[in-house]
């Protein structure tokens, strides 16, 4: 059994150290433009980033990392018509697509407020930013090919946080 920090969970239910060759069949070429595919960082660093976003772009040190205008742009949904129809197929009920993020615009099936935004990782990670209540959630998982995480696990995580706050 290995205890190296680079141990990674693989679909075969085995843990093995990353020897630098792990690709899981997912390769990005130089001409692929994406703002987040392959984003790497620590859970702590990512959590601090999410916390800054839910606090108007100001981090825990008091330094501004993003302008309030940008946060408002994130909170605005831009999809309409067929674009919105395509986005709904992802299972994100009540959401529209905003400036690189999903944005909640219908709270019928969510306990979070309109304007909550975030994004999902290709391997199941989940980020939720609620600037209204100054709440951020970062759920880290790395399991490629587990689609139920987006439509079933993420919404439950979100709603459990809000249910806990109601008590």
PLM feature segments, named:
Residues 11-167:
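Catalytic loop of the DD-peptidase/beta-lactamase superfamily, centered on the K-T-G motif
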Residues 1-5, 9:
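Single conserved hydrophobic/aromatic residue that forms the stacking wall/gate
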């Amino acid at each position: 059994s290995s205890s190296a920090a680079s141990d990674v969970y693989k679909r075969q239910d085995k843990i093995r150290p990353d020897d630098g060759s792990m690709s899981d069949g997912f390769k990005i070429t130089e001409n692929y433009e994406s703002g987040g595919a392959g984003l790497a960082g620590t859970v702590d660093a990512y959590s601090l980033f999410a916390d800054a976003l839910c606090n108007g772009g100001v981090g825990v040190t008091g330094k501004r990392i993003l302008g309030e205008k940008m946060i408002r742009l994130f909170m605005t949904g831009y999809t309409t018509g067929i674009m919105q129809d395509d986005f709904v197929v992802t299972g994100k009920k009540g959401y529209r697509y905003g400036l690189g993020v999903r944005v909640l615009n219908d709270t019928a099936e969510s306990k979070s407020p309109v304007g909550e935004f975030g994004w999902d990782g290709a391997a199941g990670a989940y980020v939720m930013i609620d600037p209204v209540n100054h709440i951020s959630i970062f759920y880290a998982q790395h399991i490629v090919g587990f689609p139920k995480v987006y439509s079933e696990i993420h919404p439950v995580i979100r709603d459990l946080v809000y249910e806990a706050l109601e008590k």
